UniProtKB/Swiss-Prot annotation:
Broad class of the protein's primary localization: nucleus
GO cellular-component term (any): nucleus
Keyword Transcription: yes
Entry GO MF terms: DNA-binding transcription factor activity, RNA polymerase II-specific; RNA polymerase II cis-regulatory region sequence-specific DNA binding; zinc ion binding
Keyword field contains tRNA-binding: no
UniProt entry keywords in alphabetical sequence: DNA-binding, Metal-binding, Nucleus, Repeat, Transcription, Transcription regulation, Zinc, Zinc-finger
Species assigned in the record: Homo sapiens (Human)
Locations listed in the record: Nucleus
Its job: May be involved in transcriptional regulation.
Protein name per Swiss-Prot or TrEMBL: Zinc finger protein 716
Location of the KRAB domain: 16-87
Signal peptide: none
Residue spans, zinc finger C2H2-type: 157-179, 185-207, 213-235, 241-263, 269-290, 296-318, 324-346, 352-374, 380-402, 408-430, 436-458, 464-486
Length: 495
């Protein structure tokens, strides 16, 4: 039988036979495989043989193939000479495998055997190089097998650990970058980095392509119809991707993939700085803690961020976009987390209770703020006058007394205020609206605080006490006037 021409650049390439692409086991090793793996082995071997026959290479049918075709347990499988000792595989997580696992991993190897001599004459035939990339002849031989077995070259087998097999040597190197987390290809437009050039090229279309797909709900435009479809799930709340382990549903497949690691405990990416382990995207973000890198910059105000998601959220300050809408009351929010907190308002649920006084709160942050009443803690200090405050909002309002800033303006009369709540109260003066009514006498008031003060007429409550003589008063102003009796102060002068 004539020899088949070898790939370009080869020297005295030998015949490609079934043994060159076969995987052989001993009987004991075969019995270590489960039923599904044995079936997989049968399918791959039969398909490899059929491909050789179609190329006119295999003449006689090996006993192994006859046995497999009859669905019998191969009695003659052996492992005296294991062909393809150096396949192109990802070995990032293959360390410390048990012997049984090692046997099973043999199923996951694409077979590569030496088909001739290397350029160096002192090397023996059938002695393999350490890797495919070391020897151009082997590399060529591998590509030749790659062409002959086009139907089977892309088969990928996985165990619980990552031992992925590739049809091309270059694909192996590209895959390894997923484990290292290294992203060598950077977009000049927005600074986003990618581990593969093809991903960068795909991403750059975002900057050049016209955004012709518009969301009818919020008006946002997209380059691809698929991106619009995914975006719509924000409004519809659709979650088509469900975890089989716990039943939790997700809007995006990527979110489901990340979630699954909670159950498996998989954290394949390690921080070289501290040795902590993460998922790939989390590792990239975590590394920026050490480097201080902030590659995502807002074109509107120049503020920089370490995460693209934080930049996306920030941009809504400028656009006013509020894509997260409450189905209960119609109120919209810029962040999904804010909507989640808001929903508790409707349920009335108060999970956080103060151990000091028993008062319950909807949010943990509100409870923490409340606790400062008992502890007296005032962590916010004014650099201008030294006055301290327990709340950041109160501190912000106070600073405006020094700057004179009054950002909240009444459209009706032009009067400006330093607090939004003060403006809100002021507006009621123009409407004449009196929403707060006394159940006791029917009298109505503009402000709730005024109603509370009025109620003391009916209840007789006197919350203001003089420290000097223990006399009590209904109103703060009455206590202030009373104190003048003790001090002898006469603030009002007759002219």
């Amino acid at each position: 039988m004539a020899k088949r021409p070898g790939p370009p650049g080869s020297r005295e390439m030998g015949l490609l036979t079934f043994r060159d692409i076969a995987i052989e086991f001993s009987l004991a090793e075969w019995q270590c495989l489960d039923h599904a793996q044995q079936n997989l082995y049968r399918d791959v071997m039969l398909e490899n043989y059929r491909n050789l026959v179609s190329l006119g290479i295999a003449v006689s049918k090996p006993d192994l193939i006859t046995c497999l075709e009859q669905n019998k347990e191969p009695q003659n499988i052996k492992r005296n000479e294991m062909v393809a000792k150096h396949p192109v595989t990802c070995s990032h997580f293959t360390q410390d495998l048990q012997s049984e696992q090692g046997i099973k991993d043999s199923l996951q190897k694409v077979i590569l055997r030496r088909y001739g001599k290397c350029g160096q004459e002192d090397l023996q035939v059938k002695k393999c190089c350490k890797s495919v990339g070391e020897c151009e002849v082997h590399k060529g031989g591998y590509n030749y097998v790659n062409q002959c077995l086009s139907a089977t070259q892309n088969k990928t087998f996985q165990t619980h650990k990552c031992v992925k097999v590739f049809g091309k040597f270059s694909n192996s190197n590209r895959h390894k970058t997923r484990h290292t987390g290294k992203k060598h290809f950077k977009c000049k437009n927005d600074g986003k980095s990618f581990c593969m050039l093809s991903r960068l090229n795909q991403h750059q279309i975002i900057h050049t392509r016209e955004k012709s797909y518009k969301c009818e709900e919020c008006g946002k435009s997209f380059n691809c119809s698929s991106t619009l479809t995914r975006h719509k799930r924000i409004h519809t709340g659709e979650k088509p991707y469900r975890c089989e382990e716990c039943g939790k549903a997700f809007s995006w497949s990527a979110s489901l993939t990340k979630h699954k690691r909670i159950h498996t405990g998989e954290k394949p990416y390690t921080c070289e700085e501290r040795g902590k382990v993460f998922s790939r995207s989390t590792l990239t973000n975590y590394k920026r803690i050490h480097t201080g890198e902030k590659p995502y910059t807002c074109e509107e105000c120049g503020k920089a961020f370490s995460r693209s998601s934080t930049l996306t959220n920030h941009k809504r300050i400028h656009t006013g976009e509020r894509p997260y809408k409450c189905e209960e009351c119609g109120k919209a929010f810029s962040l999904s987390s804010t909507l989640k907190k808001h929903k508790i308002v409707h349920t009335g649920e108060k999970l956080y209770t103060c151990e000091e006084c028993g008062k319950a709160f909807t949010f943990s942050s509100t409870l923490n703020t409340h606790k400062r009443i008992h502890t007296g803690e005032k962590p916010y200090t004014c650099e201008e006058c030294g006055k301290a405050f327990s709340l950041p909002s109160t501190f912000t309002y106070h600073k405006r007394t020094h700057t004179g800033e009054k950002p909240y303006k009444c459209e009706e009369c032009g009067k400006a205020f330093n607090c939004s709540s003060t403006l809100k109260k002021h507006k009621i003066i123009h409407t004449g609206e009196k929403l707060y009514k006394c159940k006791e006498c029917g009298k109505a008031f503009t402000f709730s605080s005024t109603l509370n003060t009025h109620k003391r007429i009916h209840t007789g409550e006197k919350p203001y006490k003089c420290e000097e003589c223990d006399q009590t008063f209904k109103w703060h102003s009455s206590l202030a006037n009373h104190k003048n009796m003790h001090t002898g102060e006469k603030p009002y002068k007759y002219e």
